[in-house]
Amino acid sequence: MKRVVLAAVTVSVIFLIAACSVTTNTTNDHKNMNDNKTLQTETATTPLKVEKGPEVTLIAKEEKQKLSNGVIVPVWTFNGSSPGPEIRVKKGEKVKVTLKNELSAPVSIHWHGYPVPNNMDGIPGVTQDAVEPGKSFTYEFEANVPGTYWYHSHQDSVNQLDRGLYGALIVEDTKEKYDKDYTLLLDEWVTDKEEIKKQLKEMTKGQIGNKSKGDENTKKNDDKNGMDHSGMDMGSDQKDSGNMAGMDHGNMKMEGHDMSMYDLFTINGKSGDLVVPLKVNKGDKVRLRLVNAGYLSHDIHVHGHDIKVIATDGQPINNPKVIKDKVISIAPGERYDIEFTANNPGKWYVEDHSKNKGAKGMKAVIEYDGSKEMKDKADEKGKLAKLDMTKYGAKKLGSFTLNQEYTATYNMDLNTQMNENEVVYTINGKVFPDIDPIQVKKGDLVKVKLVNRSKMDDHPMHLHGHFFQVLSKDGKPIEGSPIVKDTLNLKPGEEYEVAFVADNPGEWMFHCHDLHHASAGMVTEVNYTDYKSDYVPNQNIPNKPE
């Protein structure tokens, strides 16, 4: 079994935001950036770029991008913008995406939510080596599962995703017909110059090249550059773990762990007046695909219309019911598909409800043909009820039941703890790579109980290569439609049981998609004991899966 040792990162480093230097380049990562490059200053009439597959080339390169009026930042992009192009393919097509790296650092592409073959999953040090500057790599898979997915770099992903290396992947079902079909990628950025300077200064500390577990140099590298996670056991049930056990960061002074530093929110890489209107005609059947590519949850409210949530994480909801004036809470990594009929002419907001000042910019406008004056009122601080997905849609028998017989059962206790003034995020009291993997064989039926024991942190847990069915929440069976997902958010104190079939052999990550948490330990693996990979990590490449 191959494992990759994650970087042990200081708290300040964990929260660096390299994407967001407003006026100057102060890091080695951008030392080759040409300040005279063309600025990406699209107007509000420029749509999200779409690449219709099945063969696509993505070029990773540095650019500057106008996020809002007066805010231009250096970004890392696919094909010159963040987000990168929306890749649209049809069910049944054989997809071929060639990644060319023109950046100064290695990159990769992970197909978030889509069950690709293991060697196409894009995890440096686990399924492939990161693609070095000047090199290329081709990803190939069949698009057999329609839905809303997305792609992003999984090399040093806590930073590269923040820098802008992501885009949407849409697998179209040819039987579904919509007059308008829009994808909205949600993200957050930092614009405060002093905060940016502090973050960028901290970037140079504690950076560790992650090596495979068998590398003899790993320990030496860790000792020189930062804390070594290996051998650390902080199980809250162990008496000898001392003050480390159960110590939640909410009770600690932790510099930089203030997510309000993300003060500018974007939709498709734009904020405020630069967000592209969603143009419709009266009578249109409209689909909105909402993708959270950021690190904060967003409570999205569609004004002026009765809507249905028809899918979550690309998987359909059974007989969804009409709702109005409720927010849909979308956690990092999650996707929600919304459908409505355009039957209320005018201009209407689609907005985030949040106390964070960045929410002012996370607004799109549903704009009917011929409409002129905006009469709708923005209300990002208004309190609305949240849609409870555990009771939404019509109940029916899913692939699994709560009390059926399972081949394997596992528990995952998620926590925020301290070790020698370092914040770490643990599963069963340990950090990766010392967390025991979930071991399966092809065909196994697997049930996992997840409990969030952190006092203040959400943990959006993402399983690679598989879909799971949500069976229960806080001990109560799901009352509505079967819920099938690949990313599930656990708020403090919450408990879920999920089940999946081991039908995609490989070595798969199961981790928190607040990548700050993943980079500080909250990662495990689902390993097939009857699978053997041909991949051997190149020890000369600094593979950093988180």
What residue ranges belong to the model's regions?
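Short beta-strand segments of immunoglobulin-like
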Residues: 45-47, 83-88, 274-279, 399, ...
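Histidine- and aromatic-enriched segments that form or immediately flank copper-ligand environments
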Residues: 29-30, 59-174, 297-328, 348-360, ...
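Acidic-aromatic/histidine active-site loop/patch
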Residues: 183-282, 291, 417, 425-428
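C-terminal motif of bacterial Sec signal peptides marking the signal peptidase cleavage site
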Residues: 16-19
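Histidine- and aromatic-rich segments of cupredoxin/plastocyanin-like copper-binding domains
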Residues: 120-123, 127-132, 142, 186, ...
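Positively charged n-region of N-terminal signal peptides that target proteins for export
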Residues: 1-5, 10-11
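Bacterial signal peptide processing site
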Residues: 21-24
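Compositionally biased low-complexity segments at domain edges in trafficked proteins
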Residues: 179-210, 380-409, 420, 542-546
